[in-house]
């Protein structure tokens, strides 16, 4: 068997990991987050057929209102992670960001850092979740938290059973800025690979590695004796 076939086997081994599953169904109540109404808006999706959670990420697209007024969380199995919690609010800025709208992907590896400090204007890009597990009506200084005290997707959902309902909630905590409208949200869940698949992948990789070494040794020997 030549080296191209060994490469093929190795590719199979490397691909023997769990694939992420994307959930992006429709919205309740048109996605309108009423202005100054702490009862807010929510949408629930049902997940089934997955193994334990390895990773979670979420994309949120919304327009209108003031970003600094918004509080939003993702919940599952009676636990939640604040995704957006009055972005921009600090001891020195009681009102937070005056920007309007989000098109952000939130994950533990978000390259833009903490979405709470995304800046001004329309928010876009990849960020980590706000993670400030405090009442959104807290005093402005309460939002100045140490990075290590923020919740992450891993600390909130890691290792849990993903099957069942997932709820996205948003509320506008301060009236006057107008309603916000959520146009879409995508939930992506990466499950832990099943043990059988991991074992097969490791075996295939080891087998391919050994055969590659043998092939190179035979090739080197034939060149010496040629």
Q: How should each PLM-predicted stretch be described?
A:
Residues 8-15:
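Bacterial N-terminal signal peptides
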Residues 1-7, 216:
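Bacterial N-terminal signal peptides that target proteins for export
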Residues 21-191:
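Loop and turn regions of beta-sandwich accessory domains that flank beta-strands and are enriched
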Residues 15, 104, 115-118, 202, ...:
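Generic recognition of cysteine residues
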Residues 6, 22-27, 224-225:
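Enriched but not universal
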Residues 209-226:
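C-terminal membrane-anchoring or membrane-association module
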Residues 194-214:
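A short, hydrophobic C-terminal helix/tail in secreted or cell-surface proteins
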Residues 16-20:
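Sec/Tat signal peptide C-region and signal peptidase I cleavage site
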């Amino acid at each position: 068997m030549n080296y191209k076939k060994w490469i093929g086997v190795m590719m199979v081994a490397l691909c023997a990991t769990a694939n992420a599953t994307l959930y992006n169904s429709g919205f309740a109540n048109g996605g309108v987050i009423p202005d100054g109404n702490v009862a807010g808006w929510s949408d629930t999706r049902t997940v089934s057929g997955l193994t334990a959670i390895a990773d979670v990420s979420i994309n949120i697209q919304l327009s209108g209102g003031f970003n600094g007024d918004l509080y939003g969380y993702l919940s599952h199995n009676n636990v939640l992670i604040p995704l957006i919690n009055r972005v921009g609010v600090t001891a020195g800025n009681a009102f937070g960001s005056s920007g309007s709208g989000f098109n952000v992907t939130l994950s533990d590896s978000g390259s833009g850092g903490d979405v709470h400090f995304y800046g001004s204007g329309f928010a876009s890009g990849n960020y980590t979740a706000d993670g400030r597990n405090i009442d959104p009506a807290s005093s402005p200084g309460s939002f100045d938290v140490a990075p290590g005290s923020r919740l992450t997707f891993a600390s909130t959902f890691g290792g849990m059973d993903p099957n069942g309902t997932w709820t996205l909630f948003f509320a506008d905590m301060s009236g006057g800025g107008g309603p916000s409208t959520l146009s879409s949200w995508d939930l992506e869940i990466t499950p832990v690979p099943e043990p059988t698949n991991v074992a097969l992948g490791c075996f295939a990789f080891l087998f391919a590695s050994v055969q590659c070494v043998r092939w190179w040794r035979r090739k080197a020997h034939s060149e010496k004796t040629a």
